[in-house]
């Protein structure tokens, strides 16, 4: 993704905040013809040396069947965005643009096959996304 240097965000606190406040993202992997894409809620697990993105795909999802350990992937999280009119500038020699916040997280996927670990992951995901509710599930 092209990001002009003056818009590039390097502060991990800001990057983590965008991911945590916009957890519904896209998981993309390569396939033979076109990229595979699944929209799903995910969760950031910020580690001391590296970060992980946790998520769950249903077994019935065809994308799931194409994922093996070590599959390269891209997770995309979108924040706020807005059209920018050239009328808003003092200098009228401008063109329209679009400002946006987005995080592209690249990494490799690991399947969780152990039922106990899978249940723990689902519990963590549910807890993360239920935590803002008055009566969590």
Predicted regions span which residues?
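Binding-site signature for planar aromatic cofactors or substrates
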Residues: 1-137
